[in-house]
Amino acid sequence: MGTPGSGRKRTPVKDRFSAEDEALSNIAREAEARLAAKRAARAEARDIRMRELERQQREGVEDTLSLRSLGSHRLDEKSDKQYAENYTRPSSRNSASATTPLSGQSSRRGSGDTSSLIDPDTSLSELRESLSEVEEKYKKAMVSNAQLDNEKNNLIYQVDTLKDVIEEQEEQMAEFYRENEEKSKELERQKHMCSVLQHKMDELKEGLRQRDELIEKHGLVIIPDSTPNGDVHHEPVVGAITAVSQEAAQVLESAGEGPLDVRLRKLAGEKDELLSQIRKLKLQLEEERQKCSRNDGMSGDLAGLQNGSDLQFIEMQRDANRQISEYKFKLSKAEQDIATLEQSISRLEGQVLRYKTAAENAEKIEDELKAERRKLQRELRTAQDKIEEMEMTNSHLAKRLEKMKANRTALLAQQ
C-alpha cells in the first residue's frame, strides 16, 4: 500500500543555493581585499602627511630664525649709521662756521642744531630700547605665529584622521548592511525549506489518512506491536503497528496476549502439533487397513463377529476421516491466515519504517531549522544593535567635526 510521493527523493535546497553562496563568498573576499588596500593607502597617506607637516614645521622654524637674524642685523646697521651721522654732522658744521663768516642769526641756528645732537648716548640707548622692544614683539609674534601654525597643522591632521575614521565607519556600516542582506537571504532560504518540509509533512499526513481509510474500507484491524521479533529494548519502538483481517485478528486473539511474533510462534506450534496428530491418525488408519486386509481370509464361521468388528471399524474409520478432514480444513485455513498475516506484516512493516524514517527526518530538520532561525534572529538583532551604535558614533563624530571646523574658522578669523 503506497502513498503519493513516499518513494521520491527531493533535491536538497542547499545544493540549489551553493552557486549563490559561492558568488557571495567571492564578493565578500573581493570587498575585504579592497578594504585592506584602502586601509593601506590611507596609512601611507597619513605617514606622508605627517612627514610633510614635520617638514613644514622645520621650514617654519628655520624661516623664523632667518627672519629674526636678518631683522637684528638690519637694526644694528641702522643704529650704527645713525650713530655715525650724529658724530660726523657737528664737526662739519663747526668747520664751516670757522672758515666762512656768517651773520648772527646763522650762528645762533647752528648753535641750536649742535645742541640738539650733542647727546648721542641718549639717542642710542633709546634706539636700543626700541630695538629690544621690537625684537620682543617680533619674537612674541613669531612664537604665536608658530603656535597657531602648529595648531592649524594639528587641526588639519585631526580633521584628516576624523575623515579616515568616518570613512572606516561608513565602510563598516556598508559591511554590516551587506551581512544583514546575506542573513536576510539565508533566512528566506530557511523559510523556503520550512515551507517545503511543511508540504512534505502534509503529504505524509495525507498518506496516513488514506491508509486509515483503506484499512477501514477493507475491514482490517490494527494490532500494535511494541517489541518486534521478540526482543526486549530499553526504549520502546514508536509507531510499530500491523493491519490484519478480522479473522486473523480473532486467530491472534485466541493465541493469547503478547507481541505479534510470539503469538505467531504459538500458532506455528499449534500447527505443528496438528500436523503431528494428522500423521499419527494416518498411521493408525494404515494399520487398521492392514488389519482389515489380514482379516479378510478368515473362516465364514467368524463372519458374524467379523461383521460386528467391521461395523465397529467402519465407525472408527468414519470418525477418523471426519477428524482428518476437520484437521485438514483447519490446517489449510491456518496456513492461509499465516501467509496472509506474514504478507501483511512485511508490507506494513516496510510502510511503517518508511513513515517513521520520514517523520523522524522531518522532525530533525524542523528542529534544526528552528534553531537556525533563532540563531539568525539573534545575529540580526546583534547586527541591528551594532548598526545603531555605529550610527550614534557617526553622528557624534560628525558633531565633533563640525565643532572643530567652527573652532578652526574662529582661529582663522582671529589671525
UniProtKB/Swiss-Prot annotation:
Q: Where is the composition biased (Polar residues)?
A: 88-117
Fetch the InterPro entries from UniProt.
LRRFIP1/2 (IPR019139)
Basic and acidic residues compositional bias: what residue ranges? 52-61, 73-83
Q: Is the Cytoplasm keyword given for this protein?
A: no
Does the entry annotate any disulfide bonds, and if so which pairs? none
Keywords, sorted A to Z:
Coiled coil, Phosphoprotein, Wnt signaling pathway
Q: Where is this region: Disordered?
A: 1-20, 52-130
Residues annotated as carrying Phosphothreonine in the record are 114
User: Do you know which Pfam families this protein is assigned to?
Assistant: LRRFIP (PF09738)
| Annotated positions of the Phosphoserine modification | 18, 92, 95, 103, 107, 111, 115-116
Coiled coil (residue ranges): 22-49, 121-217, 260-408
What is one Gene Ontology biological process annotated in the Swiss-Prot or TrEMBL record? Answer: positive regulation of tumor necrosis factor production
Under the subunit heading, UniProt states:
Interacts with DVL3 and FLII. Weakly interacts with MYD88 in resting cells. Following LPS-stimulation, the interaction with MYD88 is rapidly enhanced; the complex gradually dissociates to basal levels after 6 hours of stimulation. Interaction with MYD88 is regulated by LPS-induced phosphorylation. In the presence of LPS, competes with FLII for MYD88-binding.
Q: Which family does it belong to?
A: Belongs to the LRRFIP family.
* Known role: May function as activator of the canonical Wnt signaling pathway, in association with DVL3, upstream of CTNNB1/beta-catenin. Positively regulates Toll-like receptor (TLR) signaling in response to agonist probably by competing with the negative FLII regulator for MYD88-binding.
Name this polypeptide is given: Leucine-rich repeat flightless-interacting protein 2
Query: Which taxonomic lineage does the organism of this UniProt entry have?
Result: Eukaryota, Metazoa, Chordata, Craniata, Vertebrata
